């Protein structure tokens, strides 16, 4: 299975170029259930286990530093992108709240993360990649809490209900190849809403959208990152055009939550203009949903175009406090 210990991994390479090559000691851990972890599954977007995994990796790096001749300053900075943005924020929250004397947290840069998971359940339109990310989240939380559904067939339509609980994460197939091999619906001409409706039972989604005491909604609330007060400097970064983790649902809600308590140590940056200028045809986002350019642009926005711009913003914050 995939490991961030592989220097050829594109995310590892980006971290090496953006941070390690600039003098930072980078700790990039594999999560529970990946690589050499013996955990029985991956608790996807489970804030508490993300936090303990990241903090344990910092402890391990500190223990190993002297053996490789590294002198660490003791300053800790957290960053992550997408799921990693959720994990880095969960880690900063836990470090400041529970281990303030152990970790000298000086900054957190949380990039394109899904911080408002319960809010995202109430949005009527599906995200890009819904047929991958949402079943991943639902089956993970079912394994964590055991309450999300009583029978997999009440949540998922056939044939997906037959194998979805053991499909994700997949040791050999990624989102694209899961779709092209027919394990998940999708492909040219299939909209996110159509893909969602092929996978999920409509009653299951409607109940979650209603909120209240619905078990999926309650699980999402447990893993929201709203409502905490960071002590160190925080950067939120994303691109307004992101179709997978829309900032309107997550980044703006997170910033508004911080603002509601008068916090002055949080900045929020939108890199959409940079993404458009660099990757949009003629420097603008394509507007025709039926065009190949539209599919290419939005298909690459979250995973390829946006990350380097947000990591550059993160490093600027870290450079100011290192």
Predicted stretch roles:
Residues 212, 217-219, 260-322:
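C-terminal catalytic histidine-bearing segment of alpha/beta-hydrolase fold enzymes
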Residues 230, 235-242:
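Short beta-strand/loop motif that positions the catalytic acidic residue
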Residues 25, 30-34, 274:
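Short beta-to-alpha linker loops that shape the active-site pocket of alpha/beta-hydrolase fold enzymes
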Residues 60-133:
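Primarily recognizes the serine-hydrolase "nucleophile elbow" in alpha/beta-hydrolase
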Residues 44-67:
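Alpha/beta-hydrolase active-site loop
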Residues 21-27, 73-76, 102-107, 229-233, ...:
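Loop/turn elements at helix/coil->beta-strand transitions in domains of secreted/extracellular proteins
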Residues 1-23:
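Short, surface-exposed "cap/lid" segments of acyl-processing enzymes
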Residues 113-229, 248:
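Accessory cap/linker subdomain of secreted extracellular hydrolases
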């Amino acid at each position: 299975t995939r490991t961030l210990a592989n220097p050829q991994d594109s995310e590892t390479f980006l971290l090496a170029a953006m941070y390690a090559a600039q003098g930072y000691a980078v700790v990039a851990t594999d999560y529970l259930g990946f690589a050499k972890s013996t955990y029985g599954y991956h608790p996807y977007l489970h804030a508490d286990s993300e936090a303990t995994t990241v903090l344990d990796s910092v402890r391990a790096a500190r223990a190993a530093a002297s053996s490789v001749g590294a002198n660490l300053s003791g300053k800790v900075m957290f960053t992550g992108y997408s799921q990693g943005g959720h994990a880095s924020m969960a880690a900063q929250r836990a470090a400041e709240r529970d281990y303030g004397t152990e970790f000298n947290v000086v900054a957190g840069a949380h990039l394109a993360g899904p911080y408002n998971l319960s809010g995202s359940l109430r949005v009527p339109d599906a995200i890009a990649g819904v047929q991958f990310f949402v079943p991943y989240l639902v089956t993970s939380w079912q394994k964590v809490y055991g309450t999300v559904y009583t029978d997999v067939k009440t949540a998922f339509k056939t044939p997906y209900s037959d194998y979805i609980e053991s499909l994700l994460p997949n040791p050999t197939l990624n989102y694209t190849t899961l779709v092209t091999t027919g394990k998940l619906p999708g492909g040219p001409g299939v909209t996110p809403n159509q893909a969602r409706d092929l996978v999920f039972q409509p009653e299951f989604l409607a109940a979650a959208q209603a909120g209240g005491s619905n078990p999926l909604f309650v699980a999402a609330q447990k893993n929201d990152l709203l409502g905490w007060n960071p002590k160190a400097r925080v950067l939120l970064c994303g691109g307004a055009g992101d179709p997978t983790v829309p900032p309107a649902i997550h980044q703006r809600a997170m910033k508004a939550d911080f603002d509601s308590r008068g916090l002055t140590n949080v900045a929020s940056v939108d890199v959409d203009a940079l993404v458009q200028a660099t990757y949009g045809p003629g420097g603008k986002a394509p507007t025709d949903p039926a065009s190949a350019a539209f599919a290419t642009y939005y298909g690459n926005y979250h995973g390829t175009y946006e990350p380097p711009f947000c990591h550059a913003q993160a490093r600027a914050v870290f450079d100011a406090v290192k």
